[in-house]
Design a protein with these regions (language model features):
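A generic structural-conservation signal
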Residues: 52, 81, 134, 183, ...
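Short N-terminal micro-motifs specific to bacterial/archaeal maturation
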Residues: 26, 112, 189, 204-205
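Short catalytic/ligand-gating loop segments at beta-alpha or beta-beta junctions
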Residues: 137-139, 178-191
Length: 231
């Protein structure tokens, strides 16, 4: 019997698999595939009464964040997202699917926004005597290739898609947190805020710790005493 099932969302948020750095080393990451499976499994397990998602992540894939948030929203058992050092960008998106969000007064929360920034290597390549040969079947096929300059048309195309993703992110946070869209837009400048400011703006529900998460479940009638298992 496991009254509360704990699930970790640590490091980069990915849709599946692990992330690698430029040297091929593994980066701490958590996949939506693993988290969604764990949430669904805990929700179906008769020995589990509540679900705790412990978050310490500064983001990653927006799709992954949306998938995790959706899994939390459709879970029939009470859910809490507990933010440790931070829940930013896609990780915060994931947390908004929980019934209740708790964070430390000094947790980083939010970073509602989208980025597509990258390094342009064209000048470095020129200095190294390298020439980029452009071969493609459509003028936008290699948009974002760091070895060629970004044209004005390509920049506009990329910005269009970033704006679409940003708007969807804002809408989902507003819906999940019960906030007005205009309120979320004011907060959606890509910055994080500390716990108290997050609480004041409705991004979280309480300042606290794992003990407060357990007390929430007790108050909801889901459990009678603190007992936590981990996937």
């Amino acid at each position: 019997y496991c009254p509360v099932m704990g699930i970790e969302l640590y490091g980069d948020v990915t849709t599946y698999g692990t992330n690698l750095d430029e040297n091929g080393g593994e980066i701490l990451s958590t996949s939506a595939d693993d988290v969604v499976w764990a949430i669904e499994d805990a929700d179906l397990d008769p020995n589990v009464s509540a679900i705790l998602l412990e978050v310490d992540s500064y983001g990653g894939s927006g799709v992954a964040g949306d998938e995790i948030a959706t899994a939390l929203k459709v879970a029939e058992k009470p859910t809490v997202a507990l933010i440790r050092d931070g829940a930013a960008s896609a990780a915060y998106w994931a947390a908004t699917g929980a019934d209740y969000i708790i964070a430390s007064p000094i947790s980083d929360v939010g970073s509602i926004g989208v980025t597509g920034s990258y390094l342009d290597y064209t000048k470095q390549n020129q200095n190294d005597g390298l020439t980029f040969i452009e071969l493609n079947s459509g003028k936008f096929k290699d948009t974002g290739n760091p070895d060629k300059p970004l044209t004005l048309e390509e920049r506009a195309l990329w910005q269009r898609d970033l704006d679409i993703m940003h708007q969807y992110f804002v809408e989902q946070v507003a819906a999940n947190r019960g906030l007005e869209i205009d309120k979320v837009k004011e907060l959606a400048d890509g910055s994080t805020v500390m716990g108290q400011m997050a609480l004041d703006n409705g991004l979280i529900d309480k300042l606290g710790s794992r003990t407060d998460a357990m007390q929430y479940f007790i108050n909801q009638g889901a459990i009678e005493y603190e007992d936590l298992c981990w996937y």
